[in-house]
C-alpha cells in the first residue's frame, strides 16, 4: 500500500518569481503575461506585459514564511501565533491557498 503524505506536511518553495514587499508589509508578485494569446492581447488591445498581484495581510504573511524548509503545518502555527483571528478553519484555508498558489505556478513543493 502506498504511503500517502498529508497535504499540510508538504514543504512549499517559491517558484522563480519576482516579488516585493511594500512598506506596510503587503507582498506584490510580478507576473509576466507570456504566450501566444497574451502577445496578441498586448499588441491589439494594449494589455500590459506584466500583471501585479497584491496579496492580503494573511497571504503576505504566509508568502514571506515560504522558505523551502518549513511545511504548511509549521507556517500555519506561525500564522496562528501572530494572527489570533486566523485560527478558524486554519488548515483548510491554508490548503486551499497553497493549492491556488501551486495551480498558478507561484510555488512548487519540495519532495
What are these regions (language model features)?
Residues 1-36:
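Hydrophobic packing positions characteristic
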Residues 2-10, 44-111:
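Long, charge-rich, low-complexity alpha-helical segments
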Residues 29, 33-52:
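Alpha-helical membrane-targeting segments
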